Structures are given as C-alpha cells and as structure tokens.
C-alpha cells in the first residue's frame, strides 16, 4: 500500500511532493519596455505598440497569442500537448485573454488578479501538474499601457496631462510552460497570503 504524505502545509501553503518544472518561458514587450534596463532580457520587443492591430485591446490579445506560441515552441511542444491554460489580463471580462487565445482551442481558466495574475497562474498551474491533472500547462498574463489607461484612468484620446510621478502600466505579455519534464527551475512551494497569490521558483 502506497503511503502519501499530505502536501498541505499550515493554513495557506502547499509543498509539492513532486515539484513541477518551468519547462520554458517567453516574454513580449512594447518599445518603451525594451528601452529600459531589462531590455536585453525580453524575447521580442515590438516597434509598434498596436502590434499591427487597429485597437489597443486587439494589440494586447496579439501579445498573448504570440507569447503563448513562442513559449510552447521553445518547449519543443505542440499546442495540442498543452492540457490547460491559466491566464488573465486587466480588462473587463478578460477580453484580451479570451480573444487572444481563442484560436488555440486549449481549455482556459480565466484569472483576474490584477498585479498578482501571473503568480496566481503559476500557483494554480503548478498545482494542476503536481496533482497529475496535466502533463503540460501554460501560465501567462498580459497588460497594455493604453488599454489599462482606457479601462481605469483616462483614454489617451482625452489627452490628460500625466504627472512625472505617475505609474506606467507595462505593455507586455509573459508565458510559462509548466510540466514534469526536468529543467533548471522547479516550483517547490505554492502559497496564498491574504489576496496575493505568489509562487516560489527554486533553482535546482
């Protein structure tokens, strides 16, 4: 008889018995982000913040679509091998996510955690893989400066003056492929603290 120890730790943590691995990752950002100190770290930097689309929302959808394809490609997988998608954005009803990933026809768990969406996606995706519900999942998120301004502040067409101290929402998307295939990074612990979802990735 196989004896399994509980992976539950305390009231809000999970220590994975068999840690899932971050098999690959991909990041796509806008021109402003590419000009910053982390510019060399991104896989793709767009020259046009609309990424060839007509609207800001379509541009953000394109970010997710391309980031997903790039991450899956870097993992050497086909989209059919991805069991689930955990993703979200900052827009109402997650429209950037829904329309951006629709063509892939992968079951989607839509998340809305604001700045914690990526960590939440990694936590839930890691739990899914560790529990044996999937061989591979993708955890991802996106945001776009212009679509976020339109959603939460002032549309750019309003020409509102921004103080120098104002925050700037990232134009970009990040995607991770999680699976049991070993790599140089695994997720050992998943925990929630209040409303913030965080994931610890340890180098092995």
Predicted regions and their residues:
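Glycine/charged-rich beta-loop-alpha catalytic/anionic-binding loops adjacent to active sites
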Residues: 47-52, 98-112, 153-161
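Conserved beta-ketoacyl condensing-enzyme motif
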Residues: 22, 56-116
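Short glycine-enriched loops at secondary-structure junctions
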Residues: 28, 87-93, 143-144, 183
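Conserved small/polar residues in nucleotide/adenosyl-binding loops
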Residues: 192-199
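Active-site-proximal alpha-helical scaffold in enzymes
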Residues: 112-139, 178
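N-terminal amphipathic/basic leader segments beginning at the initiator methionine
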Residues: 2-40
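Glycine-/small-residue-rich "gating" segment that lines the acyl/pantetheine channel
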Residues: 7, 11, 119-120, 148-187, ...
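Short beta-strand segments
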Residues: 23, 87-88, 137-143, 178
